[in-house]
Amino acid sequence: MGDAKVARTYNQDHKARQYAKGRRRVSAYIAWSYPAEANRNPAVLDNRFSTMTEVRRVLWPAYEGPQWDPSRFQQGIGGSLELFFWAWVRFQRVVEEVTGHALPMFQRVDQAGFALPLDERVLADTDTLFVFGLDHMVTEQVPAPAEIEAVRLFLEREGTCLVIGPHHDVGQSPDLQERNLEYLHHGDALVPRQQRFGSYTRALMNGLGIPVENRWGLRPAVSAAENGRIAPLTIARDLDERGWLAGVRNFNFHMHLPHYAVTTEDARSVHVLARQPIDLSRPHPFTNAGNKEFNTLVWMRPEGRRAGDVLVVDSTVFSTLFGADESLERFWKNIATAG
């Protein structure tokens, strides 16, 4: 972010955006406690983010530039958390370009320890709400009943949209050999044998009656003919009535993406719009069971008192940490402009 054309600020209160027809107000809510994540013990192997030192070692020399020097950038787990914010900047800029409104990034508990439940302070000036489920389960982030009710009322407003994405659930099995098989499948040395995310988003979805659950961490297939570009999505275009995936071929490659399992038999209420082909060269319990694709985008159309749309998709899709292209930006724009 060294190329920013305006000064950056910190420690400011959010200023509400005024409603303007045709210009959606988009907000993102990161459902983690930053201190709870940053203060995890690096001596503990599982259920934590990497330290920045570990990132630099594994991805060397990608993070050896002066902006990553210890005199300028945190080297502990906090450094890895800040990489997320670096990687969301392009998404924020694209949204602002097409809506005319800045995209605020709220945190459940921020770096300074300020807590922000998901309430009207976030929702009052929001038309499209992203909830990023990047909280490790061990930090025990759970929405209060009042938060669930606030989001329920938000979705009763005409034209609203909730985009929610619990991150991956790696190593849920007590069988250590199965955990190791998962690890060898995704191949990311920075992800431990057990890394379970999304208590907050899981509980929020349960409270709202969204019958979807994040499972596994699966490695997408790539196309050898296109220099390793991620394999195209399998898209149910006949179900995509709102055009969420218009002009979209693919999302971005990431070594361990969640499968969004639909937990209801009611095919009318939940639609799997996109599936991602899996790298079948690396065994995994999910592929061993005969699966070749995982659900990567799920949509619930307005129904009953819920006047807003619900999309379930991983937060990785809105980050450039793992790459971004024209197809991905088109998806961002589709969501930001859907009215």
Description of each model-found segment:
Residues 2-339:
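Short, surface-exposed patches at the edges or C-terminal ends of soluble domains, predominantly
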